[in-house]
């Protein structure tokens, strides 16, 4: 797996600020929340993982560039 550049990480952080809401479109993980699950962004780590507190209680991170989430309104 190729890690994103510092510039890409900063772009992710601007695109997904702490507190914004997202909805899961797809995730390549057997423990993934179901499609359509919503959550609140807690941040983006230094390797490009989107840290999300999913509304179903899951804390599984989304890997930007692999998993797909979309921003939603509150």
Predicted regions and their residues:
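Basic/aromatic-rich interaction segments and small domains that mediate binding to polyanionic partners
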Residues: 2-74
């Amino acid at each position: 797996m190729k890690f994103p550049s510092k510039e890409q990480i900063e772009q992710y952080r601007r695109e997904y600020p702490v507190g914004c809401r997202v909805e899961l479109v797809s995730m390549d993980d057997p423990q993934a929340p179901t499609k359509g699950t919503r959550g609140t962004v807690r941040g983006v780590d230094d390797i490009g993982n989107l840290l999300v507190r999913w509304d179903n209680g899951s804390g599984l991170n989304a890997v930007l560039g692999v998993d797909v989430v979309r921003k939603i309104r509150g």
